[in-house]
A protein has these predicted regions:
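C-terminal catalytic subdomain
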Residues: 252, 305-314, 319-380
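Receiver (REC) domain switch/output surface
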Residues: 119-131, 217
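Alpha4 helix (beta4-alpha4-beta5 surface) of REC/receiver domains from two-component response regulators
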Residues: 71-72, 92-110, 114
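Conserved acidic segment of CheY-like receiver
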Residues: 7-21, 25-29, 40-41, 47, ...
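… and, occasionally, acidic/histidine-rich disordered N-termini of signaling adaptors
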Residues: 135-313, 366-380
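Conserved phosphotransfer microenvironments
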Residues: 44-47, 57-80, 93-95
Length: 380
């Protein structure tokens, strides 16, 4: 907030269509020792246009009872708060409404009939400072997420292996938050390939670091481990080197033998994979806990056969836990719908289509969602 000696007045955009309330707010600001310039508009649409054309230090949003009742007022707070700090002015002295307004992004909620010079000036000062600190925090977070995204992308395999008798495709969509999703393929000569899909807990740099550490150990140890369960045990021991037990990794790790189509896997706390084989459907559920939680953890190794025409889809929880604006989950039904709509499409297209379908599903949700990773194996 500017001091009394600041070189320019505080630019205030007032959204108010009640003449009496408009006069009251102007009168209060005129009495303040600080200098303000106020431009008033009668509605949110006009305010959005004004904010696009000029720079303002603060928005005072007068909300009527009807706007609060139908939710339009709260939506206005969310939109306007992206541009400038918002203080809500209302005739309603309602604590629940005040809390909702702040949750949607308002810096303060003031009752019009109780408005005083000191109260409004203090609220403006604090609102501007909180908005400034939040903007700085968001800039730091954005920088961190760019680093995390770079780490995540740099650890993805450069190519998808060409496997006789099988078509393999993969796709990873990073959310704005960037989690610890990853996938990997490791050649195991002469006739096997290892396939991994994992999710390291945490967002930003912490999740990216744990993801990178997990993939590093996986790549270093896969060739020397005779079975998937041996690899998972080795990986768990390697990741348990510190005391940060709040962090963990879910992992679906399997080895595909080309000639037979036998797929041996361990599911360490990861979402169940979906196997569609002709008219038969089965899920490859968790066979043990996530990695990095327990030194004495136990897992079970299982084997399935991928017959000609079978499709196996392995995905991260960002796919099935995608939510629409009614908080309904994409879930396994969404995965099944995409995989059965065009079953003969190339694996890479199926993987990409599934990620995109989950993204579209949650488009209207206020939650940005999680990373989405999909690996598809089609047997010919």
């Amino acid at each position: 907030m500017p001091s009394r000696t600041e070189s320019r007045p505080v630019r205030v955009l007032l959204i108010e269509d009640e003449p009496t309330d408009l006069a009251r707010v102007n009168r209060v600001l005129d009495q303040a020792a600080s200098s303000f310039t106020v431009r008033a508009v009668p509605e949110v649409r006009a305010a959005a246009t004004e904010l696009g054309a000029r720079s303002y230090d603060l928005v005072l949003l007068g909300l009527a009872r009807a706007e609060i009742g139908d939710g339009d007022g709260f939506e206005a707070i969310r939109r306007l708060g992206k541009t400038a700090p918002v203080i809500v002015l209302s005739r309603l002295d309602d604590e629940d409404i005040a809390v909702k307004a702040v949750q949607r992004g308002a810096q303060d909620y003031l009752v019009k009939d109780r408005l005083t010079v000191d109260l409004l000036v203090r609220s403006i000062r604090y609102a501007r400072e909180r908005h400034r600190l939040l903007a700085e925090q968001n800039r730091r977070l954005e920088h961190e997420l760019k680093i995390a995204a770079f780490v995540q992308q740099s650890f993805l395999p450069g190519r998808v292996p060409e496997v006789p008798g099988h078509d393999i495709g993969a796709h990873l969509h990073s959310s704005g938050q960037v989690g610890g999703d990853f996938y990997d393929f490791i050649d195991l000569p002469p006739d096997r390939v290892a396939i991994a899909v994992g999710d390291a807990s945490g967002k930003g740099i912490p999740g990216a670091i744990l993801m990178a550490e997990t993939q590093g150990v996986l790549r270093a140890e896969a060739a020397s481990c005779a079975t998937p369960i041996e690899l998972v045990r080795t990986l768990n021991r390697a990741l348990l080197h510190d005391q940060d037990q709040d962090r963990f990794v879910t992992l679906f790790y399997g080895v595909l033998a080309f000639p037979t189509g036998r797929f041996t896997f361990v599911n360490a706390g990861h979402p169940r994979a979906l196997l569609l084989d002709g008219a038969t459907e089965s899920t490859l559920v968790s066979t043990g806990p996530p990695l990095r939680l327990f030194a004495d953890a136990a897992w079970e190794e299982k084997t399935v056969t991928l017959h000609a025409g079978a499709r196996l889809v392995i995905y991260s929880d960002g796919v099935t836990e995608a939510q629409d604006d009614t908080e309904r989950f994409f879930d396994l039904e969404g995965v099944r719908a995409v995989m059965t709509e065009s079953p003969d499409r190339p694996a890479v297209e199926l993987a990409r289509d599934l990620c995109h379908a989950a993204e579209e599903f949650e488009r209207g949700s206020p939650d940005p969602g999680d990373d989405k990773t999909v690996v598809v194996i089609r047997s010919r």
